C-alpha cells in the first residue's frame, strides 16, 4: 500500500451508498493496494466545503470528492480552478433532459409551453431544474413571462441524486397540475424500463442537447502521484470480474474513464447566469 491515506468524500443520498462505498473501500485497500477511507456527507454543499478546506479549521477535509456536475463545477470555480477533475463513469457522458407530457395532450413541443404550466425538480438539480431553465431561456421561453413554473424542491442538497423531485414532476404531469415536466434521461429510462406508467400514457416530447454528470474531483494541492494511483485503481476495475461487477452495477457503470471536461459548458454558463457560483458565506 502507499503510505498516505486518501480520504474520499461521497454523499449518502440513498442507503445503497453505504454498501457501494464499503465495496469500493475493500477493493481499494485489499486488491488495488491503495489505502482509501471514506467520509459520507449529507449534502454536496458540505462535501465541497470539505474538499476546499485548508486544514486550518475543525472542518473535515477530504482529498477527493465524488461530485455531481454542479458540485464539480462549484469546486473548480471556488478554488480558482486549483481543483482537478480526475475520473468519471462511462454513464456520466451523454445525459439529456427530457420534457414529458400526456400523450396526445396540449404540449408536444417547447413552443406549446406558452401560457401553460411546467413542472421542474429541485433547485440544485442540474438535470431537472438548472439546465431545463437554461435551455428554455436559450429558446426564448422565460418562466413567469411565457409559462408558469411549478417547482418541487425535494431533497435539496442532494443535487437531484435521489430522483424524488423527478417523481414529483411525473406525478404532477399525470394528475394535471402541470401540462409538462422536465426530468433527466436516466430517470425517464427507468420509468419506462420498470413500466411505472401505463404504456402510451406519457410521451417524451423534447430532448435537450447532451451534457455530462458526475466527476471525481481532487482538492487543491493533492500530490499528483496520489491522484494517479487513485485513478489507475479505478481504471483497473473490470466488469467481467464478479466482485468488481457487483460494485460497478450498484454505482451504475461498466467502466471508469479519464476526465472529459467537454460536457460541462452548458451547465457552467447556466450556473453563471442563475447564480449557482455565488459562494455560501
Give short role names for the model-derived ranges:
Residues 1-73:
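Extracytoplasmic small-molecule ligand-binding "clamshell" domains
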Residues 38-55, 70, 144-171:
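Short helix-initiation/N-cap motifs at beta->coil->alpha
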Residues 50-58, 113, 173-174, 230:
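Hydrophobic residues within well-ordered alpha-helices
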Residues 66-80, 137-138, 167-199:
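A ligand-binding cleft/hinge motif common to bilobed small-molecule-binding domains
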Residues 82-92, 145-152, 193-210:
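Short beta-strand->loop
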Residues 86-109, 216-219:
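Hydrophobic/proline-rich hinge and linker segments of small-molecule sensing/allosteric domains
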